[in-house]
Amino acid sequence: KDKLSNRVDIFIEEKAFSVTEASNFLEKIKSDFYITAHANQFTSGGLKVGVDNGAVSVDHLEVITDQEIDYLSKSDTTGVVLPGCSLGLGIPFAPARKLLDYNCKVSIASDWNPGSAPMGDLLMQASLLGSTEKLSNAEVLAGITCRAANALSLEDRGSLENGKIADMIGFKTNDFRDILYNQGKLKPSFICKRGKIYN
């Protein structure tokens, strides 16, 4: 009503909001908000609710069937995998390789929080996910740049293209592969925000 937010995030799980509760809630608010759903972390079922209600992203996906992956691949929803949660809770990673092989849009995020993902280094997490899931450097870097921007409804940034906002970070290296090879130890040498460089 007061336009304080343009996004809603709902956790769809047996011990949070049920599939029915989430469906009823999202049906009422989907015309006014971007939707993100945290789903399929421990049980399947929530992904379909998110996709059916036009979610921009569905996050987690550690527990997901082939049918759900196929359903996601035929939608505009970005699947966001959260390797920090898997590391923090000792559960398997979301099947990022299979998601990409099905042509799903896949982003990588940290879900940094004190309960299940207390490690905040996205590059370290993305590097470990890439090694475990057999992702290429390009797939991992896309997952934390352009696809991450899509998951946040920020299509005006995330890649270096004419007409897009020049938000980026730079690393002092002669080989872009060093960024992931160093698993978070290589730190940015500069930040560029809206075309302005900060050292």
Report the location of each language-model feature:
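Structural signal for hydrophobic packing residues in well-ordered secondary-structure cores
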Residues: K1-D2, I29-K30, A148, L152, ...
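Metal-coordinating catalytic core of metallo-dependent amide/deamination hydrolases
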Residues: K1-G45
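Receiver (REC) domain switch/active-site residues of two-component response regulators
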Residues: N6, V56, D167
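Generic beta-strand/beta-sheet core signal
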Residues: F11, H38-N40, V80-L82, A109, ...
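Active-site-adjacent C-terminal substructures of enzyme catalytic domains
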Residues: E21, S44-S159, R177, Q183, ...
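Hydrophobic anchor at the start of a short beta-strand
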Residues: I35, V106, S189
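C-terminal cap of metal-dependent C-N hydrolases
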Residues: I144-C146, N162-N199
